């Protein structure tokens, strides 16, 4: 499917969207898609790499994979919440069981998306998430 023509982010939002996913192919395709829609995107290959970068505090929205070696997506979110970071989070995973969903809800995660996620569903989730923080 061809990528849509270049779009602008909703309401002129320019804060970065951070992708945290250990699968380089997934991260690269998500980044390409989001950049096509005019978003500023930063990718990280692990939760520890993301948490070590001070820019994580200023992210507009976080797309975090749940199942990564070392630190899971929900563990990353736990660390963020302990730091007082309240950036909106979209958790993406190929396996979202009931306990993961419950924990994600307790941590204030706004969207839970199953992999593979359709491009239109992801863009809709990001736009909704960003609109809710204005």
Residue ranges and their predicted role:
Residues 75, 96-111:
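Alpha4 helix (beta4-alpha4-beta5 surface) of REC/receiver domains from two-component response regulators
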Residues 115:
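A Lys-centered signature of the CheY-like receiver
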Residues 1-18, 24-31, 120-134:
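Non-catalytic signal-transmission and effector/linker regions of two-component phosphorelay proteins
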Residues 27, 69, 97:
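The feature encodes the CheY-like receiver
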Residues 54-57, 79-86, 107:
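Conserved phosphotransfer cores of two-component systems
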Residues 43-61:
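Acidic, metal-coordinating helix/loop segments flanking the phosphotransfer/catalytic sites
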Residues 45-46, 72-75:
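Acidic catalytic/metal-coordinating carboxylates
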């Amino acid at each position: 499917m061809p990528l849509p023509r270049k779009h602008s982010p909703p309401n002129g939002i320019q804060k970065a969207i951070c992708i945290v996913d250990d699968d380089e192919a997934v991260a690269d395709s998500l980044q390409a898609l989001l950049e096509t829609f005019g978003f500023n995107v930063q990718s990280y290959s692990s939760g520890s790499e993301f948490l070590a970068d001070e820019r994580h505090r200023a992210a507009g929205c976080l797309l975090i994979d749940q199942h990564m070696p070392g630190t899971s997506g929900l563990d990353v979110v736990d660390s963020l919440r302990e730091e007082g970071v309240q950036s909106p989070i979209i958790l993406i995973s190929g396996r979202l069981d009931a306990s993961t969903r419950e924990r994600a809800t307790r941590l204030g995660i706004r969207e839970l998306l199953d992999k593979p996620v359709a491009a239109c569903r992801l863009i809709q989730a990001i736009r909704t998430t960003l609109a809710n923080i204005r």
